[in-house]
From Swiss-Prot:
Family: Belongs to the CDP-alcohol phosphatidyltransferase class-I family.
Extra facts: 'Jovtenky' means yellow in Ukrainian.
Membrane-traversing stretches: 104-124, 126-146, 164-184, 189-209, 261-281
Gene name, Swiss-Prot/TrEMBL: PGPS1
Topology class, membrane: Multi-pass membrane protein
Catalytic activity line of the entry: a CDP-1,2-diacyl-sn-glycerol + sn-glycerol 3-phosphate = a 1,2-diacyl-sn-glycero-3-phospho-(1'-sn-glycero-3'-phosphate) + CMP + H(+)
Organism of derivation: Arabidopsis thaliana
Low complexity composition bias: residue spans: 62-82
Protein name as annotated: CDP-diacylglycerol--glycerol-3-phosphate 3-phosphatidyltransferase 1, chloroplastic/mitochondrial
């Protein structure tokens, strides 16, 4: 009787030590205590069934709460790398991975490559002195202008934007516009009262091409600086109006270069001067924004 009473006292003391919550939780030590407690409880289960079952219930509660605290993500683990290989953060300003494509030859990029490949065809058909040469040149330029809008729309709508496409798109636009301007300057426009005027299209062409070269260099420099400079050179509504008038003017001039319709040629030349003025104006606006950022 004395030995059995002493054994029950030892079991009760061990159970109380086990059930006492410790400030620092150690999983191996806690596991060893559970094993020892289960051994003692199996020996004394016939004498103290109610007390042991109650202690085991409390023991399982503390074990589950401790393991849940260990499995709960801490503040340091919230900033760990996610499954996509990107650092998780609370900033929602960055686009989700599905908005950009890892493929190089997406549909918008193929359309952009088609514009680059159309530049030699534009040059070849421009020097064909016939009506179908004029029609082919104008059709190629119109198709390039349409795909310029279409590839950007598809990249946003279908989430097929890529870094290669973002680099190639402005290059294709500048190649097409610069080639068309140079081609038009090689064949002076005939004005009935004044005869050929070789400078009529040369002046706005120099302004437009010079502006595009300057903005390309400025954007390349801004990309290597802070984010505020990139915001300063972002495309604005003035640049969109410049592009619209530029494409319209070049289409009219290509379609009417062998035509005797004076007002059509004059309207195309007038729109080209408007486009040149908008180009210089937008360049001044960009430079003013950049100057404000640099002076802060």
């Amino acid at each position: 009787m004395l030995r059995s009473g002493l054994a029950s006292l030892i079991v009760d003391v061990n159970l109380r030590r086990t059930l006492r919550p410790s400030p620092t939780f150690s999983f191996p030590a806690h596991l060893s205590r559970c094993i020892i407690t289960s051994r003692y409880s199996s020996r004394t289960s016939l004498r103290f069934p109610i007390q042991i079952s109650r202690h085991q219930h409390r023991l399982s509660y503390f074990s589950s709460s401790s393991s849940s605290e260990q499995s709960r993500p801490t503040s340091s683990s919230r900033n760990s790398f996610s499954g996509h290989g990107q650092l998780d953060s609370d900033d929602n300003s960055s686009p989700p991975p599905s908005q950009s494509s890892s493929k190089v030859l997406t549909l918008p990029t193929v359309l952009t490559l088609g514009r680059v490949a159309a530049v030699p065809l534009l040059v070849a058909t421009f020097y064909v002195d016939s009506w179908w040469g004029t029609t082919a040149t104008t059709s190629i330029f119109i198709a390039a202008a349409i795909t310029d809008w279409l590839d950007g729309y598809l990249a946003r709508k279908m989430r097929l934007g890529s870094a290669f496409g973002a680099f190639l798109d402005p290059v294709a636009d500048k190649l097409m516009v610069a080639a068309t301007l140079i081609l038009l300057c090689t064949k002076p426009i005939q004005v009935a009262e004044l005869g050929p005027l070789p400078w009529l299209l040369t002046v706005p062409s120099i302004a437009i091409i010079g502006r595009e070269i300057t903005m390309s260099a400025v954007r390349e420099w801004a990309a290597s600086q802070n984010g505020k400079l990139l915001e300063a050179v972002a495309v604005n509504n003035l640049g969109k109006w410049k592009t619209a008038t530029q494409m319209t003017a070049l289409t009219i001039l290509l379609a009417s270069r062998d035509s005797n319709v004076g007002w059509l040629v004059a309207s195309g030349a007038g729109l080209l001067y408007v486009s040149a003025g908008l180009s210089v104006w937008s360049l001044a606006v960009y430079m003013r924004k950049i100057w404000k950022v640099l002076m802060k």
